[in-house]
Amino acid sequence: MEPIIIPIEDVIDLHTFKPKEVPDLLEDYFQACVEAGIYYVRVIHGKGQGILKKRVWHILQKNDLVIAFRDAPSEAGGWGATLVALNQKV
């Protein structure tokens, strides 16, 4: 499988990725963000039935680069997106 190239910005939309790609994708994305000096990001997982959100939050709880996360405010996606603070001292 070819590596997926994604631009490193403060927002990532997971709609275009397969669920099985999400854990490795987020790990690589967070690492790239820290290396680029981006410490606050928004992960868009969508609202739907909340299955992907639960998976994302599970991943965030276990990731050493993540220091905090919460639902985005309504103007930034509400419960269809998660705001993530990354560790600046890695």
Q: Could you tell me what each predicted segment is?
A:
Residues M1-V90:
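Long, charged, low-complexity intrinsically disordered regions
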